[in-house]
């Protein structure tokens, strides 16, 4: 059977569905595949100053990771995918949110003298994201997902809008931290927390992709 290939005429989401393991490259290039999954791949790639033909060639050279569970998500039932999202994204991300909050609070005290202005901004932006996500996850788990699995018609437009709002805040955080770049005098905690924020961003993008581009489209 011929291998499916990514073409420049696809949307970003369609390209990811061909090979979910291109998510890592898209994340590295800061190409939005979650809330921006509906956008043309050509448009998203060229907006980053990349040549679409060479970029698509690179994407098609990415070998699927055999141990990866990403491709399995496309074969899951609604119930299996909901369970996967809760276990692999909601639970770990709630822990990350708490961990990052505590780490940023510590950094505010340790690096107050030289970096309080930047850290105030980062802390406030991050806490705004956390304030959005904690009730969002709870609503999905306690209301929207159970009704959806029970066969009820669920309007996901509100959740998608919330995803987009959080995505915009996350993009702003990405920019003000210069892609989570630590200042030259940053301590080990500084490095760890900024690394954790970068990992959280990538994980949340993948999480939102599974919801917007797979789960919410299921009948």
Regions found by a protein language model. Name each.
Residues 1-219:
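Small-residue-biased structural context
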């Amino acid at each position: 059977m011929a291998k499916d290939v990514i073409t420049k005429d696809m949307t970003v989401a369609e390209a990811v569905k061909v090979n979910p393991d291109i998510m890592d490259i898209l994340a590295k290039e800061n190409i939005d595949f979650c809330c921006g999954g509906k956008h043309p791949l050509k448009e998203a790639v060229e907006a980053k100053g990349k040549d679409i033909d060479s970029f698509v060639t690179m994407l098609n050279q990415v070998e699927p990771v055999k141990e990866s569970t990403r491709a399995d998500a496309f074969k899951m039932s609604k119930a299996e995918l909901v369970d996967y999202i809760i276990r692999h994204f909601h639970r770990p991300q709630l822990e990350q949110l708490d961990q990052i909050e505590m780490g940023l609070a510590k950094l505010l005290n340790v690096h107050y003298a030289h970096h309080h202005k930047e850290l105030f901004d980062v802390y406030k932006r991050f806490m705004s994201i956390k304030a959005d996500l904690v009730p969002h996850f709870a609503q999905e788990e306690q209301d929207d997902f159970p009704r959806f699995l029970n066969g009820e018609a669920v309007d996901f437009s509100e959740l998608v809008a919330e995803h987009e709002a959080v995505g915009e805040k996350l993009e702003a955080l990405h920019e003000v931290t210069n892609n989570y770049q630590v200042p030259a005098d940053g301590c080990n905690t500084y490095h760890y927390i900024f690394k954790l924020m970068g990992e959280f961003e990538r994980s949340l993008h993948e999480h939102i992709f599974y919801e917007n581009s797979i789960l919410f489209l299921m009948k």
